[in-house]
Amino acid sequence: MKKLLILLAVAAVVFVGCAKDFSFDTVESKKDVIDSGVAPEDIAAWESEVDADFAKVMEALGTEDEASALAYFDAKYGTEMSKTGARYAAARAGSSGKKSGSSKYPAMTNMPFNKDGAVYISGGTDDMVGTVIDWVSPKTLPGSYYHGAVLDLDKYDPNNESVYCLETAITKGAGYETADDWRNKVNACVLNPAYSMTKSKLDSAQAYMDYYCDMNNKNMEYGFFKNTVNIFNVVTKADTYTWYCTKVVWWVYNKYGWDIDSNSSRIDWTTSGLYTIVKDYYAVRYFYSSKKKNQAIADYIATAKQNIVLAEEIVLSPYFNKVYENIRE
């Protein structure tokens, strides 16, 4: 696991530059080796070769060389990474430039904004951010939920719903959204705290996040993963430089004293694009040992679960009750 993280961290450094040469005329297929199921004589050399080829895949993700790198890996090792890559590329290209969750649907005029600390969750595939994270994240619940925010009721103005009042993440990193933004999401639900809250403690937690959410504070970045396209380099919860929306929500409640990351067993991680590529990588690296392969995959997913705060994990948290939901696709 540690070797993989080091490899991926190195690979993630380079995402631009001259086009790489992925020549299919010189590819040496290893399919027969893998099909044999017999461990190679030099396991260390095999793992180094696989790691080097996989590093090229990581380097190419998000560039013009992506399709070629994935196809080369497939041709050499008999995997189907190109299918996963095609879905990822389509996600990145989909409806570029829209706000997170902005939609063609009518505004949700009945969405409530009346509970301090209420959590707002949205999903759907009508924008670029949504399609990318929808591809990466497991999809267990109706709504394809991926985005989140937490309401600071003291900032909400019922006479002007264009004021910033929901702590979340935007393109700069941590930031604010408006009630008007949320009325125009694709799919959405509202979660109220299931237990009574101490206002002074909640105010303190919201004030802490306000430092990062301040629209003039740009000493940070947005990302579900470090370097954005490197889907393996997961941002940790403790990191206060790289923010994504549900991590902001988690921080508010963590400061309050609640851990709202449920890590629910109801969430099926095998439905995620992240799982698909990790599975293919380890299936090649440890083709001769299903025990090693399965353990490596399990260890990686366990690490991802520990660090990632999914919208679905917040929806399934016992700290909240769902009081509103509107699923339109």
Show where each model-derived region lies.
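Activation targets extended, charge/polar-rich intrinsically disordered C-terminal tails
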Residues: 25, 33, 42-43, 50, ...
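Non-catalytic propeptide/linker segments at domain boundaries
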Residues: 49-114
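Glycine-rich catalytic cores of cysteine/serine-nucleophile enzymes that process amide/ester linkages
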Residues: 118-195, 228-240
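Positively charged n-region of N-terminal signal peptides that target proteins for export
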Residues: 1-4
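Bacterial Sec-dependent N-terminal signal peptides
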Residues: 15-36, 90-92, 96-99
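Active-site nucleophile-His-acid catalytic modules used for acyl/amide transfer and hydrolysis
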Residues: 189-269
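N-terminal mature-domain "stem" immediately C-terminal to a signal peptide or N-terminal signal-anchor/transmembrane
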Residues: 25-63
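Bacterial N-terminal signal peptides
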Residues: 7-15
